């Protein structure tokens, strides 16, 4: 069982014995969290996570592409701002602020940003590949 300590990063060892983060801080202040590149014209900010869930803010410049890909995680995304052409399992829809989409595990999905904007992505389980070890 993981013991949660307010406002600290819990650490646990992975199979190799390396320390890895298992949860984020309790309070997530936007201007205190780093942004990292996630492709040309795309950057992401990891908002919060534990071993079961992760929330990530993703900003896109107009014309930026979230290349079609798959992952074993379930994903739900919310369009905070902008306009996006979203493809999932061969279906394409244009989504704007207030819209969202669900991606089942292993479904091929991607986006093209038609107007600069932000997506809020939620994954389960967490995307450990997004965490710096």
PLM region descriptions:
Residues 90-105:
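Short acidic-glycine-tyrosine-enriched beta hairpin
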Residues 39, 56-70:
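Conserved short histidine dyad/triad with adjacent acidic residue
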Residues 59-60, 70-86:
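Short, conserved beta-strand element in jelly-roll/cupin
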Residues 105-129:
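Ligand-binding loop in jelly-roll beta-barrel domains
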Residues 76, 83-85, 92, 108, ...:
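Structural motif
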Residues 80-81, 96-97, 115:
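A cytosolic small-molecule/anion-sensing beta-strand core signal
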Residues 1-52, 132:
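A short, N-terminal "cap"/entry segment at the start of jelly-roll beta-barrel domains
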Residues 65-66, 85, 101, 105-110:
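Histidine-centered metal-chelating micro-motifs
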């Amino acid at each position: 069982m993981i013991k949660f300590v307010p406002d600290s990063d819990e650490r646990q060892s992975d199979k190799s014995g390396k320390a890895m983060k298992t949860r984020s801080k309790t309070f997530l202040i936007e201007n205190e969290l780093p942004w990292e590149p996630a492709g040309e014209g795309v950057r992401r900010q990891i908002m919060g996570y534990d071993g079961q869930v992760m929330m990530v803010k993703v900003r896109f410049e107009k014309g930026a592409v979230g290349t079609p890909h798959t992952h074993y995680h379930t994903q739900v995304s919310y369009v905070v701002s902008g306009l996006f052409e979203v493809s999932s399992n061969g279906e394409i829809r244009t989504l704007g602020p207030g819209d969202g989409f669900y991606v089942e595990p292993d479904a091929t999905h991607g986006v093209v940003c038609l107007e600069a904007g932000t997506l809020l992505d939620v994954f389960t389980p967490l995307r450990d590949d997004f965490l710096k070890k």
